[in-house]
Swiss-Prot record:
Name of the protein in its database record: Putative 8-amino-7-oxononanoate synthase
Family named by the database record: Belongs to the class-II pyridoxal-phosphate-dependent aminotransferase family. BioF subfamily.
Reported function: Catalyzes the decarboxylative condensation of pimeloyl-[acyl-carrier protein] and L-alanine to produce 8-amino-7-oxononanoate (AON), [acyl-carrier protein], and carbon dioxide.
Binding residue positions for pyridoxal 5'-phosphate: G107, Y108, S181, D206, D207, A208, H209, T237, L238, G239, K240
Species for this entry: Syntrophotalea carbinolica (strain DSM 2380 / NBRC 103641 / GraBd1) (Pelobacter carbinolicus)
InterPro entries in UniProt: Aminotrans_II_pyridoxalP_BS, Aminotransferase_I/II_large, AON_synthase_class-II, AONS_Archaea/Proteobacteria, PyrdxlP-dep_Trfase, PyrdxlP-dep_Trfase_major, PyrdxlP-dep_Trfase_small
Length: 390
């Protein structure tokens, strides 16, 4: 077997400071972890509410595993559909205010499955230019015509929709991140709702980074912006603010039935194990209650504090609304140098490079958790300012 081609590509990536590798973290996803045996402040986890080591989730996982075993043995359409799956789906539908919900094994599997399952060659998908990679791949798998509009630019989107209108054959769908994963900014959902009504199409929101975090009840970006019930398809994850693993779509009953029959990532995957599903149920109960509200309030205070310390280093659109803080650094080499220096100082924050972000828009992507301590964040902000000015 010829391996030279792949090795040359890896060598080129290394020369360009673009080679990715794995770092070994020990312990739970707390505010501090052991990174290669060294204590560091964890500033790059999506465990926004700090639920990944919550005693209620751990106990629920252990109880379900003792009762139901470690795995389901098959896909949901064979023998892998359990009462726990249905309980969590019912709670998620109620949480998002929809008729029904359907679990997927990961956010990537959800977006690719939803778009591939619902859309086809006669359909058109309108997709924000900074949507997550799983949405981009889902659009490709669907075989629908994909029209990409400039980031958050609803005026440009309307022009593109008007241009497509005379050619319309099938279903139209607008798809957007709710909270954009690399910039932390919000989709203009009220304006997108107006467009979807004007052009009689569907609106799908990937709220992986908003679910559990935004809104008085943690229902996400739609609740925060006052248009939750106008969203047709809500995609969310259980592996970020909810502290577990898996993903879901919530929407009309007919959509869920259709996806059960057409979404390949659902049909051909062994279902989520009982312990994982039970943790999702426990997490949702916390998010819905007073503890979840208190954690969101604390997280918001920390977001305001941290972004306020780094105002000069952040894009102007960053206002501390979300726990994603993009600290722009430009090119790969200074980005990775800054990340390595901060790691040596006990701050674990990853450098983000293309293709995850556009050329020239490399960054340190800091993410906050409700369990972070003020003094740790102040020290981290001071060190970030120092490395950026070096």
């Amino acid at each position: 077997m010829k391996l030279d081609h792949w090795q040359k590509t890896l060598d080129h990536l290394r020369d360009e400071e673009m080679l990715r590798g794995l770092k070994t973290v020990s312990g739970a996803q707390r505010d501090h972890v052991l990174l290669d045996g060294k204590d560091v402040l964890l500033l790059c986890s999506n465990n926004y509410l700090g639920l990944a080591d919550h005693p209620a989730l751990i106990e629920a996982t252990c109880r379900a595993t003792r009762d139901c075993g470690t795995g389901t043995g098959a896909s949901r359409l064979v023998s892998g559909s359990m009462a726990l799956h249905e309980e969590l789906e019912s709670k998620l539908a109620q949480f998002k205010g929809t008729q029904r919900a359907l679990l997927f094994n990961a956010g990537y599997a959800a977006n690719t499955g939803i778009l591939q399952g619902l859309m086809g060659a006669d359909d058109v998908i309108f997709s924000d230019s900074l949507n997550h990679a799983s949405i981009i791949d889902g659009c490709r798998l669907s075989r629908a015509k994909t029209v990409v509009y400039p980031h958050r630019d609803t005026h440009a989107l309307e022009r593109l929709m008007a241009k497509e209108a005379p050619l319309r054959k099938g279903q139209w769908l607008i798809v957007t991140d709710g909270v954009f994963s690399m910039d932390g900014d919000l989709a203009p959902l009220p304006e997108l709702v107006a467009l979807k009504k004007r052009y009689d199409c569907l609106l799908m929101v990937d709220d992986a980074h908003g679910t559990g975090v935004l809104g008085d009840s943690g229902k996400g970006t739609g609740e925060y912006l006052g248009c939750l019930t106008d969203i047709d398809l809500h995609m969310g994850t259980l592996g970020k603010a909810l502290g577990g693993f898996g993903a879901f779509v919530a929407g009309p009953d007919v959509v869920v039935q259709f996806l059960i029959n057409r979404a390949r990532s659902f049909i051909f995957s062994t279902s989520l194990p009982p312990g994982v599903v039970a943790a999702g149920i426990a997490a949702l109960d916390i998010v819905n209650g007073s503890e979840g509200r208190q954690r969101r309030m604390n997280l918001q205070k920390l977001c305001t504090l941290f972004t306020g310390q780094l105002t000069e280093s952040l894009p102007p659109e960053v206002r501390g609304e979300t726990p994603i803080v993009p600290i722009l650094t430009g090119d790969p080499e200074p980005t990775m140098r800054a990340s390595a220096w901060l790691e040596a100082q006990g701050i674990f924050v990853q450098g983000i490079r293309p293709p995850t972000v556009p050329q020239g828009r490399c960054r340190l992507r800091a993410t906050l958790m409700a369990t972070h301590q003020v003094e740790d964040l102040l020290r981290a902000a001071d060190l970030i300012r120092k490395v950026l000015s070096a």
